[in-house]
């Protein structure tokens, strides 16, 4: 069984809709050996807004022009579907519900079928196994685990750090990924035809996201 760690970056989230500008991933084996790592740039067909809610700037991993040279989401949809729906692969993300939201809303924007896959959230795993920690952000968690951080917000690197967090929790708890998932069912999400389910909620994105289309600029 292999593991796929992925992360998504967006050019902006105007209108409540994240316009994907990159999807990065790391494919690893059960011992966390990296088999493949790639950052797939996406033309967001929307301008970049590089400010957080607190006013701090966000540094892009590449010049803006590189993103606008890339294929758009519709062109890359088959590749993303192949990655996320591959058999014999367990999918992980950090705060993965956000990435799921971005994917589904782009499916609405580009009139593509919804993805169907399962995913596990390393943020929830960290919260479950490290209840004494107050950190939720990937960078801060890496700091507490003494994982070197160089290039946050390049999608493939964030995916790599997500893998390192999962690996570190396994080491601390003297178990493997399957052991973590068995003990923490709350980290599980299923995505099927625009409906996202986890331990606490069932969320239908279908009607909610359809209303975002008019906000796309």
Model-derived segments and their meaning:
Residues 99-120:
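Substrate-recognition/cap helix-loop segment adjacent to the acidic, metal-dependent catalytic center
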Residues 42-60, 64-67, 122-159:
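Active-site-proximal helix-loop-helix substrate-binding element of RNase H-like nuclease domains
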Residues 167-217:
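Acidic two-metal-ion nuclease catalytic site recognized across multiple nuclease folds
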Residues 104, 163-170:
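Short, amphipathic alpha-helical segments that act as regulatory/interfacial helices
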């Amino acid at each position: 069984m292999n593991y796929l760690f992925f992360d998504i970056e967006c050019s902006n989230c105007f209108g409540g809709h994240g316009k994907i500008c990159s999807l990065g991933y790391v494919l690893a084996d059960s011992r966390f050996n990296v088999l493949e790592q790639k950052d797939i740039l996406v033309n967001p067909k929307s301008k970049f807004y590089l400010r957080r809610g607190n006013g701090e700037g966000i540094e892009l991993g590449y010049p803006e022009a590189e993103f606008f040279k890339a294929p758009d989401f519709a062109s890359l949809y088959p590749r993303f579907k192949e990655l996320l729906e591959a058999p014999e692969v367990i999918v992980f993300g950090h705060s993965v519900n956000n990435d799921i939201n971005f994917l589904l809303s782009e499916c609405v924007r580009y009139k593509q079928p919804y993805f169907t896959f399962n995913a596990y959230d390393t943020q929830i795993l960290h919260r479950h196994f490290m209840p004494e920690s107050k950190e939720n952000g990937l960078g801060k968690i890496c700091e507490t685990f003494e994982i070197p951080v160089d290039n946050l917000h390049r999608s493939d690197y964030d995916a790599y750090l997500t893998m390192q967090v999962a690996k570190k929790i396994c080491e601390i708890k003297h178990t493997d990924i399957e052991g973590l998932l068995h003990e923490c069912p709350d980290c599980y999400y299923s995505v099927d035809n625009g409906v996202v389910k986890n331990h606490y909620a069932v969320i239908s994105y279908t009607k909610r996201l359809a209303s975002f289309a008019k906000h796309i600029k």
